[in-house]
Amino acid sequence: MQRFVCSGVFRQTSVLLQISPVSHCHTRRMQDSPSHRSLKQLISSQRWLNSTTALCSPTSQKTSASGQEEPDPLHDKSSGLIQRFKKTFKQYGKVMIPVHLLTSTMWFGTFYYAAMKGVNLVPFLEYVGFPDKVVKLLENSQSGYALTAYAMYKIATPARYTVTLGGTSLSVKYLRKHGYMSTPPPVKEYLQEKMEETKERISGKMEETKDRFSERMEETKDKFNEKLQETKDKVSFRKKKE
């Protein structure tokens, strides 16, 4: 009896899964149908969601946080002057802008006074090897003191940046000492807090998106199963007729 039942089930399964021209045609239609394409898109989207969720895991967050640790630019001596200037401006811009404006005014005023006292910059520029256009412009310019002061101002850029960084560092220490500026937490703790906040926001968005995709996938799966069952019924009916 068991053999008879097993053989009957086997015959029915072989009939349903047998590939004939008709079933092949229906299978191709099913593969080309919008529901089948939607199912493929949803499956690929589900894989993408899973991979993105894995990237947002605590392990990956710790790895990225450890790789992004940076020292305070005011105390970082490893980077160049320009990089320190940019990083300090990004972190302490509210303090650095007034300091830079004040020191720049003092620099330009000093150079303008030196030009009025007869400082001639042309021989120095020729000795250093500046382009002839710049040298002739200074030599024949009607602006006189202002242009000479501006040229000295640009030449002294490294010194100006160094003074600005020093003034910013002293200003930050003074403001923190008197309570006008809060002392920032260690870089590691700050980055961990930021990463946790970002992780929570991303996790919330991911859960919403995942739920929407799951609902759509279930609907598309149901439609696809109905179409597949209809095709199997048609194939089995035609086989019985034959």
Swiss-Prot record:
The family database entries (InterPro entries) matched by this protein are listed as: FAM210A/B-like, FAM210A/B-like_dom
Membrane-spanning ranges: 92-114
Which Gene Ontology terms of cellular component type are present? membrane; mitochondrion
Q: Which UniProt keywords apply?
A: Coiled coil, Membrane, Transmembrane, Transmembrane helix
Major site of localization recorded for this protein: membrane
The annotated topology with respect to the bilayer is: Single-pass membrane protein
Q: Name one Pfam family in it.
A: FAM210A-B_dom
Q: Where is the composition biased (Basic and acidic residues)?
A: 198-236
**Polar residues: compositionally biased ranges:** 57-67
Domain DUF1279: from-to ranges: 76-188
Subcellular localization(s) per the UniProt record: Membrane
Gene3D superfamilies in alphabetical order: 6.10.140.1430
- Provide the residue span(s) of the region labelled Disordered: 57-78, 198-242
Q: Which ranges of the sequence are coiled-coil? A: 188-237
Top-rank taxon: Eukaryota
Q: What is this protein called?
A: Uncharacterized protein C18orf19 homolog A
Task: Tell me what organism the protein belongs to.
Answer: Danio rerio (Zebrafish)
